[in-house]
Amino acid sequence: MSEFFKTVPVVKYEGADSSNPFAFKHYDANKMLMGKTMAEHLRVAVCYWHTFCWQGSDVFGANTFDRPWSKAASEMEAAKLKTDAAFEFFTKLGVPYYSFHDVDVSPEGRSIKEYINNFAQMVDVLQAKQEATGIKLLWGTANAFSNPRYMSGAASNPNPEIFAYAATQVFHAMNATKALKGENYVLWGGREGYETLLNTDLKRERAQLGRFMQMVVEHKYKIGFEGTLLIEPKPAEPTKHQYDYDTATVYGFLKEFGLEKEIKVNIEANHATLAGHSFHHEIATACSLGILGSVDANQGDAQLGWDTDQFPTSVEEYTLVTYEILKSGGFKTGGYMFDTKLRRQSMDLEDLFHGHIGAMDTLALSLERAVKMIEDEKLANIVDQRYAKWNDSLGADILAGKHTLQDLAEYAEKNNIDPQPVSGRQEMLENMVNGYIFK
């Protein structure tokens, strides 16, 4: 078997004073925090597509990467070489998990039968790699957006045969995820949306998408898949408008089709900002609704209006996000999955390590600071105090449904109430949080 990353040693934790570019400065997998190791809290995963499939092209230019695992006599041989490279990378980096789309790991072929046969062979290859290395699958998914057949959608397509083709891919991708002991299955509707309303029946397409998701849930129970089903929100790109716009939109969709107890969300940082929200907002919203499943850890560029999928470097942002996750009990089956890609000019194989090492150190620093915020309870206590009156008889009775509008109007008049505003102390709280982050 070829060694693809000969110049890179196994990446180890060396501490903040290390000058070794191939060492973690802050990510110490075995460090104990709140009763768990750092690795158990973060559950880090590497994505297959950007890391091993993307060749550095963009809409204005051709490939800039020259990946040795792409040079093979056949597509299947290239897929197997890619698997060798991937698991060498996972092992040297020391991550516990990875994730993939079906066509990341297997050639699509020239027919649906070739697709099925190729994928089945590659699942066996992946299974052997997992057993040999101990690397686990965080989640699997099907790519129902890249092939031209999906230009008008997959589940929302006007043609039911394309719906059936997408169903075939999801059927086999779910089965593969179960066979590989994956802990989640993700559904991202990259083409589930519209370019123009002039040729779009919104009600019909939403009904099609709802039925597709119901079928996914049915299949989960049929095959005994014990992982979590996840929808990944995104407002646009590649379509003008996607139906899974943001967390709140997805929750409304799930409620409409009776799926709110069956499917959670996989939040991506860059998707949140494209929707006009902060990453913190989307995580907090998902946690408040009880539907946070997993996180695609990356960041966008504030000056650009598209999905740049950069490696996360903001400890400020990820401290607040990790704080929300810890408040809600931490990850169960999900984790921080790096949906990240190098910049086109970062051509060297070593750059893959630099990007992931920095991202893992960012998560480690953020976790340590979020844990301190949880343990000190200062922020939580201030929030509790802000809403304390809702625990008194009036507030509790309102929420319990014991009062009508008329009751409250009579109460206000009888008691001549004159409630006064109280400072929200935002600036003080921001200073407090900075004290944790920059200490």
From Swiss-Prot:
Its EC number is 5.3.1.5. InterPro entries: Xyl_isomerase-like_sf, Xylose_isom_bac, Xylose_isomerase. GO terms for molecular function: magnesium ion binding; xylose isomerase activity. Binds 2 magnesium ions per subunit. It is an enzyme of class 5 (isomerase). Its cofactor is Mg(2+). GO terms for cellular component: cytoplasm. One of its GO terms (biological process) is D-xylose metabolic process. The active site is at H101, D104. Keywords: Carbohydrate metabolism, Cytoplasm, Isomerase, Magnesium, Metal-binding, Xylose metabolism. Mg(2+) 1 binds at E232, E268, D296, D339. It is found in: Cytoplasm. The keyword Cytoplasm applies. It catalyses: alpha-D-xylose = alpha-D-xylulofuranose. It comes from the Bacteria. Mg(2+) 2 binds at E268, H271, D307, D309. Homotetramer. Belongs to the xylose isomerase family. HAMAP family: Xylose_isom_A. This is Xylose isomerase. The gene is xylA.
